[in-house]
Amino acid sequence: QVKVEKAECDTSNYNLTMVLSCPQSKEILYRAAKEWLATHIQNFQQKFQYDDKVTGTIKFRNSSYLHATKSYRQKATIDMTGTFDYMVTITIKDFKYRVKTEDAVANWHEYFIFNGTKTSNGAKSLDMKNFFLWSEDVNAMKSYSIDAGKIADGIWAQAKELEEDDF
C-alpha cells in the first residue's frame, strides 16, 4: 500500500512536490520508475536528462497539454492552447520516493502577446506565475498537476507489478 506523505504546490513558482512511502525497496522503485517512464512518457529518451542509480535520481523534461481562456473587454474570449514544459525530478530511496516538477513554462502559437511574453522561432512562452496571473483560469493548471500525479501513481503501480513478478 502506498501512502502520500506530502503533496504541495509552491504557488509563487508553480512547483509541485509529492512524497510517497511504500513497502518496496529502492532497487524495485528505481526499476519501476525507469520502466514506467520509458513506456508512458512519449519520446522519453529524447526528454531524458539525468540518471544516477546510486543516488536514485532521474531527471527529464516533460510537457503537459495547455488550455486556458480569458475574457477580453468583457466580450470576446481568448482561447489559448499549447503546452506546459517543465523539469521532473524523481528521487528514490528505500520505501519512499519523491516526484517534483519545477521550471515550468507555458508555450503556445497563437498570435496574441501580453506583458512578459518571450518569443523564439514563432513560439511564445511565459513563466508559470505570469501565465496564471494573466489567464485567471482556475482550470489552466489541471493537466500539469494531473500529469505529475500520473507519474507518481505509475511508478507505484509498476513497482507493485515488479514485486509480484519477482515471487
Please give the residue ranges for each predicted region:
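Ser/Thr-rich, low-complexity intrinsically disordered terminal regions
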Residues: 1-167
